[in-house]
Design a protein with these regions (language model features):
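Core alpha/beta nucleotide-donor-binding catalytic domains of modification enzymes
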Residues: 1-85, 95-99, 106
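Conserved beta-strand scaffold positions in the cores of enzyme catalytic domains, especially
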Residues: 14-16, 119-123, 237
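Residue-level detector of flexible, active-site-proximal loop/helix-junction positions
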Residues: 19-23, 126-128, 175
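Short alpha-helical segments and helix-capping/turn motifs at coil-helix boundaries
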Residues: 29-35, 123-127, 221-224
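Extracellular/periplasmic catalytic domains that process cell-envelope and extracellular macromolecules
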Residues: 40-42, 132-134, 229-232
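Short catalytic/ligand-binding loop motif for oxyanion handling, primarily in non-cytosolic enzymes
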Residues: 55-59, 97-100, 130-133, 147-150
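Conserved Class I SAM-dependent methyltransferase catalytic core
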Residues: 72-142
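S-adenosyl-L-methionine-dependent DNA methyltransferase catalytic core
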Residues: 111, 137-242
Length: 242
């Protein structure tokens, strides 16, 4: 990710390091020597944008969901603001962060307000801004100079959701077996049989009896794993394991 950013913005200063090694002080404490060094190097900061690790609050995480040590890194955004004092702040995460067992989002909001920031918090769905996918994310907007509003963002930039067909219909004519990006994968025979079953029976959700044992007749949240996307609707949230 950093290499891509550096290619897009030549000459920009890149720092690849854990945030807690740069801002190592406790909230409410005086700036540490390391923090003062970072501040001197940064100078004035107009906008700070942060996306703390979301795995610990993802609904797809069945191991450390809502109680992951990495969730505490959300609070490093509050410490950054305390030390650097950026004029505007944007924090993005999965909606599950709002239900973290240690209330990292709520504690961050309280700290930002104590620092004099005006806040607007809420959940936005990209399909409400013209995307062809359902993807909800928690946003925190904070500013020292005005009252931010997620509602205004919805009003100014909201748009009708686009369909899956709008995004990928052209791929039907773009198949190139010699191209990594334009060639379909070769599913295993069992997977191909399930795919054909959906189309042959005009179904969008694979019946339990057609699923493998690990996802058969169980109370799970992976319904779409063996489903078919609706061409005339936005896609469900696409994950790396889709």
């Amino acid at each position: 990710g950093l290499r891509v950013y550096e290619r897009n913005f030549p000459g920009v200063e890149i720092c690849h390091a854990p945030i807690e090694s740069l801002f190592d002080g406790e909230i409410g404490a005086a700036a540490t020597a390391r923090e003062r060094e970072v501040v001197d190097n940064l100078g004035r900061v107009d906008v700070a944008v942060g996306g703390p690790p979301c795995q610990g609050n993802s609904d797809l995480n069945n191991h450390t969901r809502r109680n992951d040590p990495k969730n505490e890194l959300y609070l490093r955004m509050a410490r950054f603001c305390e030390v650097v004092r950026p004029t505007h702040v944007v924090i993005e995460n999965v909606p599950g962060v709002l239900h973290d067992r240690n209330s990292v989002a709520q504690r961050t909001w309280a700290t930002l307000e104590d620092l004099g920031y005006s806040l607007s918090t809420g959940v936005l769905d990209v399909q409400d801004f013209g995307a062809s996918q359902r993807r909800k994310r928690s946003f925190t907007l904070a500013s020292l100079s005005f009252q931010p509003s997620l509602g205004v963002i919805r009003q100014e930039f909201g748009a009708h959701a686009r369909t899956l067909a709008w995004a990928i219909a052209d791929l039907e004519k773009a198949v190139d077996q010699d191209s990594v990006f334009d060639s379909p994968p070769n599913p295993r025979p069992a997977s191909l049989e399930r795919i054909n079953y959906l189309f042959e029976n005009d179904l969008f959700d694979l019946p339990d009896e057609q699923r493998p044992d690990c996802h058969r007749l169980k109370n799970h949240t992976y319904r779409s794993m063996y489903g078919r996307m609706h061409y005339e609707r936005p896609a469900q949230t696409i994950t790396t394991g889709f």
